[in-house]
Amino acid sequence: CYFSRYFTILNNKIFVKNIVTIRGTGESTIKEEPSSFDADETCGIIISITEKEILILAQQNTVKVGGQYRVYFQLGDAVPCEVKGYDSKTGLAVVSVLISQTTNGIQKSIAAVQMGTSKAISRGKYVIAVGNPLGNMSSVQVGIINSTSFVSSYVDGVITLLSTNLISQSKGSGFFLDEDGRLIGIITHDGDEAKETNFIKALGISDVTTNLERLANGKNIPYFGIRVSTVTEKIARENELPEGVYVESVILDSPAMATAIQKGDIIQEVGKNSVKTAKQLQQVLSNYEIGANLSISLKRFSPTGYKTVLCYVTLTSLMELK
C-alpha cells in the first residue's frame, strides 16, 4: 500500500546514506561525531557524487563562503570541505568534498539522493522529514502535507511552500523525501510566527533546481534586486491594474535600482519573454548569465493612467543580502 513504501524507507534507513552533518571548525582536526546542533553546524544532503567530488546541499545561513568546515559522515568520519557556491536569496549552499580526501569506507557508505519534483506533491500525501527536523542529528519524522498553496517571497521571485502537520522546532532543519526516497523539499523557517506552535514546512525543490545546478557547477546566481507578487486576472479586474508581475520593493544599490525600476511598476516582458507571474519572472531570470543586458517592458502609473516604459538592466553576481 501507499504507506508501506514509507515504512520500507524508514525500516531500511535508506536515507542514512544521503545525510551528513557540516560543522564549522578552526584548525582542529579532532574527529568526533556530533549528536546535537549549535550555531556553527547544520545538516546536509548528498546531491551528487562524481569521480572528483561529493556535492552536498546545505543551508547558507550557517555555511559561509570562506569559512572552515568539516563534513561528518554517518560512520563518524570527518573530512574537510569547501563552500562551492551559495544563494543568499534562499539561504542555500552547495558544499564540496574531494573524493581524494575520503576513505573507501566512506565511499561505500554514502549515496546521492535522487531528485524528485515538488510540483506533483498534493495535500494529503505522506512526507518524510530527515536530517535535523527535531533539532538533533539523524532525527526523522513522517507527516502529511497540509497545503501547497502558499508561497514565500524572495528576491527576484517566489517559492512554493510545502506545509505539513508536523510540529516545528526552532533549531530544526533538514529535507523532505517522498514515498520513493526522492528529495522534494528543503526545510525552512521562513514565515514562522512568534507563537508557541509552528508547523514544519519546506521550499519546493522544483523552484530551486535551476539555481542548485548553477551552484553545483561553481556558478553564481544572477541578481536583479526586486521583490514581487503576481497581478492575476482577478486582481487586475477588481483593482483596474494591468496584469503582470508587481514590484513590491526595490533592493538598495541593486541592478533594478540602477535602472530606475520603481515600487508599483508592473513588469510584463523580460527580453523577448512574456512574464505574467512571479514564478515566470524567476524562471526567465535564471536562464540568463551574469552580465546579461536585458530589456524590461513594464507598466508604470501616471496621472493619465498606466503607460508602457522600457528599461535596460545588467544582471550582476548575487551579493550577500541583508
What are these model-predicted stretches?
Residues 269-297:
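PDZ domains, with a preference for the canonical peptide-binding region formed by the helix
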Residues 1, 7, 179, 183-242, ...:
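C-terminal cap/linker of serine protease catalytic domains
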Residues 117-119, 123-157, 192-195, 212-215:
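Flexible, gly/ser-rich surface segments that form the specificity/activation loops bordering the active-site cleft
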Residues 47, 52-55, 184, 256-278:
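Conserved PDZ fold ligand-binding element
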Residues 19, 23, 54-58, 120-133, ...:
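Active-site-proximal beta-strands of protease catalytic cores
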Residues 1-70, 91:
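N-terminal activation segment of mature serine protease catalytic domains
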Residues 48-131, 135-138, 170, 276, ...:
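Conserved active-site neighborhood of the chymotrypsin/trypsin-like protease fold
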Residues 100-112, 141-199, 243-248:
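Active-site region of chymotrypsin-like
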